[in-house]
Amino acid sequence: MQRPRVLSGVQPTGALHLGNWLGAIRNWVDLQSSHDTYVCVVDLHAITVPHDPERLAEESLSTAALYLACGMDPDLCSIFVQSQVSAHSELCWLLNCVTPLNWLERMIQFKEKSVKQGDNVSVGLLDYPVLMAADILLYDADLVPVGEDQKQHLELARDIAQQRINARFGSEEKPVLKVPDPLIIKEGARVMSLSDGRSKMSKSDPNEGSRITLLDPPELITKKIKRAKTDPQMGLQFGNPDRPEADNLLGIYAILSGRGRDAAAQECAEMGWGTFKPLLADATVSALEPIQHRYQQLMGDRIELIRVLDQGRTRAEETAQATLQRVRQALGFLIAS
């Protein structure tokens, strides 16, 4: 029986943090043994906003190394760099030509980011969701792990596939593109900022104390957790909308300590912040230590790391080219012999 296919990825710019790991990568690790898993370093997305060209390649390698250090197995999944598979850019262009402009202008993330960019906002930022659609549709993905903030982008990919490609160039019996479904994983899916329990932990937050990166040393982790925003109440609990920081930090502890939500809630029900924060810091340091150790090993052997990426690229290109050929034929292009 063919395994359901999953596609996901993370931008290489900025250090990966607890939110990336607990909300995404940890779930990919669980999926890879039961799903045909494609994981890419989405460097083409990274250049839709100003970036440092002298750091992009190194950050791409670093991100791939962290995927592996977190438990992704190149024998069970395909790990590759997005820009090294040219079909992403070509399919994006083909999808651009059938996607209405107003579909992109209503994207919430574009509205938010374009305000920050002002007059410097790029066409690439507007077109980001179409490139994301190309990423997904290229691999005939059955499922796409998404958080709440990415659901709108996946819905766009589904609409492009159904309404703009399959309905116009295919048939119900013979669709051109597979329409993917969302895979929304609840626990740990949304890790919030250490400085604001109502905002998602983010690489782009100018306050570095708002996030714990996967490569932070123990003393910095302890410092960030010590300074994390709290409230004046004694005892930690889940589900109180007036205590978002308690919910967030207790949720992180439940996962990183391995205790689970029920046991963590019981343990910390009457605990003060002064007692809880060192516990959380110790659990975080212990959880990240093996990842950091493996990462250093991988970055010390660039030849092996690049071999893994080449292997993943070869697999990805085979799948992507087959999809791209179907789309070219459906749109009526002259196919090279």
Swiss-Prot record:
It is found in: Cytoplasm. SUPFAM superfamilies: Nucleotidylyl transferase. Catalyzes the attachment of tryptophan to tRNA(Trp). The lineage of its organism: Bacteria, Bacillati, Cyanobacteriota, Cyanophyceae, Synechococcales. A motif ('HIGH' region) lies at residues 12-20. Belongs to the class-I aminoacyl-tRNA synthetase family. One of its GO terms (biological process) is tryptophanyl-tRNA aminoacylation. Homodimer. InterPro entries: aa-tRNA-synth_Ic, Rossmann-like_a/b/a_fold, Trp-tRNA-ligase, Trp-tRNA-ligase_bac-type, Trp-tRNA_synthetase. Keywords: Aminoacyl-tRNA synthetase, ATP-binding, Cytoplasm, Ligase, Nucleotide-binding, Protein biosynthesis. The keyword Iron-sulfur does not apply. This is Tryptophan--tRNA ligase. It comes from Prochlorococcus marinus (strain MIT 9313). Its EC number is 6.1.1.2.
